Amino acid sequence: TNKDDFFEIKRHQNKTTVTAYRIKKGVKSDVFFKKTYSKLTTKEIWIYGLDDDDCFEVTGQGTDFIKVRLVGGQNKDTYNVQNGKKVVVYDFKTKENEFVTKRGLRKLTDNYETNVYDYKKLKYNSNLLIPSFGSNPDDGFKIGLININTKNHFERNPFSAQHKFSAFYYFATNGFDMSYTGEFANIIGQTNLHINSKFTSPNYAVNFFGFGNETPNLEIDNNEISLDYNRVKLRTILINPSIQWRGHLGSSVRFGVSYESIKIEKSLNRFIDSVVDDTKNLTNDFLGALIAYSYKNRDDNAFPTLGLETTIELGYKSNIKTSKSFSYLKPSVALDHKISSNGQLVLASKFLGHLNFGDNFEFYQAATVGANSGLRGYRNERFTGNNSFVQSTDFRINIRKLKTSLLPLDIGL
């Protein structure tokens, strides 16, 4: 409550009894809460003192206890922890508190979201499984699966942990790719650990037509040349750990390092044969570092009528074998704004850029423009160069919202 309270936590083997008293004239008096929790049905007990001066007393002998988290909240609180096993104390670092013993784990922080009770705080985990399929000339028919698993424990930023796994198979090349992104909250203070990894099979392909804006697409004018002519098979292994700071309004800053191994799979009678003719150049390993800033704020993820998303990434990569290195900058901005009062019609614009500094990069690290980067009507990676810039604008119409027993749907153009 927002008054002076005394919390008595008696711990027994496989069960814990919590009794809450009102403090009157400096001593505990009326009982306003009492309950015994069984370890068979309870994983953790969270006790919030809220405002005013509160006292927490933890007693009991044994080892197999329910984990207890004590959250003092505002004002001066007193903690008398006689048995600190599986006891965690949270309170404000800059406020005065009294600790009678040194037992238990203390986590003193001025993080408001941790120390203040929020009845909306989710107490369950979630798992989202998304099937994906599509078709285009470069990939052929493709099928895939995306799984997002979110853990919501006590300490969050904005969740305790999140795991994203995706896998796609491409029928045109018989290639596949897999990626994993993990984020773990508050590894050091309010800093998250971010892990990004990717693997592509030896048959996974990208396109390369040469450097410049006037490179020909011979497949259009010559029926004897297939789409395979400009395909390059790349086996990729990427590991990118980083630390991430998250802001309260949708911003984040990430700093990390990376290791990347890329192998070109030799294929006969393709354009790449004229570019890479030395078997020593087929495999390259890179070490890198990056710093990235992102901001995202939208009123709706499915059909935003008002939103802003921007990212900027500055990085450096060095070839381990040749010691050649280069740096790059990748900025992007996306804007969404409704142009009708009811939000059914939305104007959406996106700006993408890629700048490489120096010439010591491989062709698959160059800036590209194509169907997979906003240039509609062209093949993926249609144009390649040192730098690139793409701007696209959409008019979006939200025709109808449907609520079904399986999934909510937004139908639009």
Name each region found by the language model.
Residues 4-6, 44, 53-55, 65-67, ...:
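Detector for repetitive beta-architecture
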Residues 25-28, 110, 121-128, 155-164, ...:
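Flexible, solvent-exposed coil segments and beta strand-coil junctions
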Residues 179, 208-209, 223-229, 278-282, ...:
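C-terminal outer-membrane beta-barrel translocator/porin domains of Gram-negative envelope proteins
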Residues 2-25, 93-100:
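GD-rich hexapeptide-repeat beta-solenoids
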Residues 46-48, 58-60, 71, 78-208, ...:
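Outer-membrane beta-barrel initiation region
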